[in-house]
Amino acid sequence: VFSGETPGNADVSPRAVPTGVAYHGRSTHNASASIHMSRLNPELGLWQGIALLSTSLLGTGIFVVPALAATVAGPASLWAWLILIVLVLPVAFTFAQLGRRFPHAGGAPHLIGRAFGPRLERLSALLFLAVLPVGLPAALNIATGFWQVLFDLDRGATLVIQLLTLAAFLALGQRPAKASGWVQGLIALAIVGSVATLWAFGDLPRADMPLLPPLEGDGPKLAAALGVMFWCFVGLEAFTHLGEEFKRPQRDFPLALLLGVLLAGLVYWACSVAVLSFGTYGDPARDAGALPLLFDQVLGGHAR
């Protein structure tokens, strides 16, 4: 049985404690359980953590999911975003507390290992790795789509752009978490600034598009929209590995996780208001290019 908190630079492995032995209280260097020093440098502050989390949740979803949700549920999708935020916050709070108590680079698999043993820890780690061959090509394809808006690209040029994007991912991944925090902080500002620009120059909200429209028998549509929107918050549990990289994980990690979820959810909701107001949804082509179409309508053809 494990209770209490471990310090940010210590890892108490369940395999190090003999079977049947109860281990209570805070871990110290004199404890009989084996303790390993942190393998990561604690460099992240609160704002960098918020930037890392919010931009990761926004990701490529900010460009397509609001339009997909609008196609499924229409104006009722605005309610669905708020419902989803309320549902996700307890999950975020749970992982925030786990990351605060047991900060470790292993993240969710490490927590599973503490609770259920090394076999399930390895299995869950493999499941996380299995996402890469599926998710990364999709992200690269979406990134290439933005270049195709600007240039007429053939298959060779598209492949070169995807390889360069992948190389940029790998290069940034070799840098400390602080560097990623700064880069993603700039991305977060760009995303929030883009949505704010749409609101400012698009005169949002409009009188004909209420921020919370009345619900009239939209229950099935809400459920379908929530299924689409949940994609935006899948992977929230993966952020538990960042707990070890915070300078003050006890204080900053839970705040960063909760505030990052709130910020991402509100940006999604604000983008959905813009999509619904300008009608950039309704079919696969418009859903995929919703954001460029929005800028085209609000600021003119060069803005896209």
Regions found by a protein language model. Name each.
Residues 23, 29-67, 72-76, 89, ...:
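Membrane-interface "cap" regions at the ends of multi-pass membrane proteins
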Residues 144, 156-205, 216-219, 257-261:
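Membrane-interface loop-to-helix entry segments
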Residues 68-72, 80, 89-166, 171-174, ...:
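Hydrophobic transmembrane alpha-helices that form the core helical bundles
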Residues 44, 49-63, 68, 201, ...:
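Hydrophobic, membrane-embedded alpha-helices of multi-pass small-molecule transporters
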Residues 110-117, 149, 258-304:
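TM-loop-TM module centered on a large, flexible mid-protein loop between adjacent transmembrane helices
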Residues 66-72, 142-152, 204-216, 281-289:
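Membrane-interface helix termini and inter-helical loops of multi-pass transporters
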Residues 50-51, 77-83, 122, 159-164, ...:
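Hydrophobic alpha-helical transmembrane segments
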Residues 3-11:
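Intrinsic, low-complexity polybasic segments
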